[in-house]
Amino acid sequence: WDIHNEGTQPSVRSVTNRLDAERVAVREALGYGAPHFPLADHYATDGDEWMYGRKGHEQLVDSGDWREHIVLTEHRYMREDTQQGLAFLVSVADWAGVAAPTATGLLAIGSAICDDDFRSSGRTLERLGLAGLDRAGMTKLLAEGL
């Protein structure tokens, strides 16, 4: 499996573009403005260059350096990216009242694959003790930290 090859096919990209749009919507709901560093910029062939440059993606695919055997139920794509990152995104979207159907659906699929309810076991506002914050409290936390 190579995340930069098989993981970036057009059909997969359409899903990640929707997921990224939900991430940007959550950022905006929290009061963050641009730049949002959309993932699509990494694959763009025109416009402003992003942090990897125009040939970055092509060079990653051609290198073969990212090819790896994965045990999906144990891999970081599930246990870090989904259980921790996506669970957090979904919980913040819920808190902020932002629709995140792609993130929510992927979280449910990841939970089923791993036979683990990532909404319960993942990193969420609830598990961090932050779900009870009101808008002013969240704004203060984001500006000042704990």
Predicted stretch roles:
Residues N5, Q9-S11, E22, V26, ...:
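A broad "ordered helical/assembly scaffold" signature
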Residues V12, T16-D65:
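Small-residue-rich helix-loop
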Residues W1-P10, F37-H42, R67-E74:
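Short, flexible active-site loops
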Residues G47-L146:
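C-terminal helical cap and adjacent loop that interface with cofactors, partners, or active-site loops
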Residues W1-L19, T139-G145:
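Substrate/ligand-engaging "lid" and interaction regions
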